[in-house]
């Protein structure tokens, strides 16, 4: 599905990422972990075409995307739920979802995907005609995730989904991510500072420190790792 090799990227003369390499398989949830300033955001921007890598490759479904535009990458099926949600606050929930379904081939396809989204997030059916800006923070995050997945992407990037949310809302969103991966084969890149939450639903993970991959392993291996426990879990 996604294979990143030897990735270097940054801003102008300042390099942030140093030879990052990682993979995400079909229907797999992979956590990208690290503290603020570790390089997670730059990595996401490099994968989605917002930042152009200076060195390395980003191969998705066998195609090199490192020099492609963000729109091209989006059309290939890589969709990001950005940190901060970035909803159209004066538009209704349904209108926000329609904005995410720009690639739906037919109205019937959109309605089928909409029903799937409502099944995953029942509260959004109740709020369909409500302005997105009037929702709670947790409900707004649900709309942001739903808008990203209504087009049924191949790879969903969740960027800090737990930020500022109550634990029960985070659990609900991560449960939907697990369902998508298991039932629909959608791959998930989970970019998180909350390592406990991330590893609770991920299959594997990578820890980024100072723009480099410091550790990698299964969720169980990383949870048991002494460096992870001391540096990130406070154990």
Q: Which residues fall in each region the model found?
A:
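Conserved ABC ATPase signature
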Residues: 131-135, 139
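ABC ATPase C-loop
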Residues: 148-149
